[in-house]
Amino acid sequence: MNEPTQITDTKKRYAAGVLKYAQMGYWNGDYVPKDTDILALFRITPQDGVDPIEAAAAVAGESSTATWTVVWTDRLTACDMYRAKAYKVEPVPNNPGQYFCYVAYDLSLFEEGSIANVTASIIGNVFSFKPLKAARLEDMKFPVSYVKTFAGPPTGIVVERERLDKFGRPLLGATTKPKLGLSGRNYGRVVYEGLKGGLDFMKDDENINSQPFMHWRDRFLFVMDAVNKASAATGEVKGSYLNVTAGTMEEMYRRAEFAKELGSVIIMIDLVVGYTAIQSMSNWARQNDMVLHMHRAGHGTYTRQKNHGVSFRVIAKWLRMAGVDHLHTGTAVGKLEGDPLTVQGYYNVCRDTHTKVDLPRGIFFDQDWGALKKVMPVASGGIHAGQMHQLIDLFGDDVVLQFGGGTIGHPQGIQAGATANRVALEAMVLARNEGRDIKNEGPQILRDAAKSCTPLAAALDTWGDITFNYTSTDTSDYVPTPSVA
């Protein structure tokens, strides 16, 4: 890599024509980021023959003020301040041809409290830039002064636990299955059985909205009837995530208002509604004392590939600022993408007060979250009672463990499946609190608990050996990929 020289002679710098991005001032290897800068780390793969520093400068330019040619109107602005500055480029370990590119952006480039504006700048244009074979946004750092322009989660972990009166353990949930095709009445029956058996939550899946087989209003009515009956039967606060995702904001508000009228404690939206809609629903949830659950539907289209797209750790940061209370963040042991360390990094982003640099977990920047409330991570997708020790060891207490098929697919029925999960959870938490090594003793702890719980014994017999131990595509560049098997 050759250290380029910025053209400082005004006449030459603004002469009509084309200059390299580094020469225009989008590279500064001596730049020291300010406390008020927004920082971004990109993984870039330059085209053959393209100098990595020039590629980094192009990323900085195209994500801030540059265009392909010199424009004299730059001189009408404080262009030296507004130009993003690539300030460090280093090879990605064990990935020839890939480079980590650090870029600093002046805070005044961004609108306060707008994730839509952040994304339009940082990922809006540069990812289709021809000099790059591929680009991926790996991490970001936001100054606390900018973080404070966002309201963040409307409820947060602490208040949610107070409303539920449930402490000292993970929360339990399940997604109603099959997620499409049930009538409203049968859907409500599934919800009742799951909650009566010991779950804290049931939930809609990402693509259940309002279809010919079940209108959204029917679903809400039958589900809330089931929630109320299960709460009365168990003496516990129960809930079911009512998906209010719709084609317009007006319709989403209408569905959310109806959920509130029925007494729901929680509503749900999908990531695909977009960041402006997410922030709008977050404001509504805050004004109406409602927990807001976020399903990350669609994220894998741009988070999964290691060399191109956006890391989910960045999405998690954006969503914490945008203001969601629950966020699907991976299981590490289930059927969906994510190795243990990388997924733990996502959880830390959701739950930390101050996130520290942690390269094995993919965290490249310190992040002060100011007074933003914490997001409750959700582990969902291909998990079952036999993995309870792994889940608690990996993620601790502040997590929702959602067993969809692992509840509804139980050989003795839905209520038995819920009971199996609740007993497995209670047994594991008790063993941990007594000082036992649940990571290594977990299988035996579960077998001992199953001696007095037929549903748990059946669950272990059915799924005890089921794993999804495939190699993840998105792993740390700094440590070998660990296994949970």
From Swiss-Prot:
Q: Which Gene3D superfamilies match?
A: Ribulose bisphosphate carboxylase, large subunit, C-terminal domain, RuBisCO large subunit, N-terminal domain
Q: Give residues annotated as binding Mg(2+).
A: K203, D205, E206
Which catalytic residues are annotated?
K177, H295
Which metal ions or organic cofactors does this protein require, according to UniProt? Mg(2+)
**Which terms does the record give in the GO molecular function aspect?**
magnesium ion binding; monooxygenase activity; ribulose-bisphosphate carboxylase activity
Q: What's any GO biological process attached to this entry?
A: reductive pentose-phosphate cycle
Site for Transition state stabilizer, residues = K335
Residue positions where N6-carboxylysine is found in the record: K203
Q: What reaction(s) does this enzyme catalyze? A: 2 (2R)-3-phosphoglycerate + 2 H(+) = D-ribulose 1,5-bisphosphate + CO2 + H2O; D-ribulose 1,5-bisphosphate + O2 = 2-phosphoglycolate + (2R)-3-phosphoglycerate + 2 H(+)
| Catalytic EC class | lyase
The entry marks the following residues as binding substrate, namely N125, T175, K179, R296, H328, S380
InterPro entries, per database record: RuBisCO (IPR033966), RuBisCo_large_chain_AS (IPR020878), RuBisCO_lsu_C (IPR000685), RuBisCO_lsu_C_sf (IPR036376), RuBisCO_lsu_fd_N (IPR017443), RuBisCO_lsu_N_sf (IPR036422), RuBisCO_lsuI (IPR020888)
Q: What is its EC number?
A: 4.1.1.39
What keywords appear on the UniProt entry? Calvin cycle, Carbon dioxide fixation, Lyase, Magnesium, Metal-binding, Monooxygenase, Oxidoreductase, Photosynthesis
Which domain of life does this protein belong to?
A: Bacteria
**Keyword Metal-binding in annotation:** yes
Q: Give TM segment ranges.
A: none
The protein's role, per its UniProt record: RuBisCO catalyzes two reactions: the carboxylation of D-ribulose 1,5-bisphosphate, the primary event in carbon dioxide fixation, as well as the oxidative fragmentation of the pentose substrate. Both reactions occur simultaneously and in competition at the same active site.
- In the UniProt entry for this protein, what further remark is given in the free-text comments? The basic functional RuBisCO is composed of a large chain homodimer in a 'head-to-tail' conformation. In form I RuBisCO this homodimer is arranged in a barrel-like tetramer with the small subunits forming a tetrameric 'cap' on each end of the 'barrel'.
Entry similarity comment: Belongs to the RuBisCO large chain family. Type I subfamily.
Under the heading NCBIfam families, the entry gives: PRK04208.1 (NF003252)
Instruction: Return the protein name.
Output: Ribulose bisphosphate carboxylase large chain 2
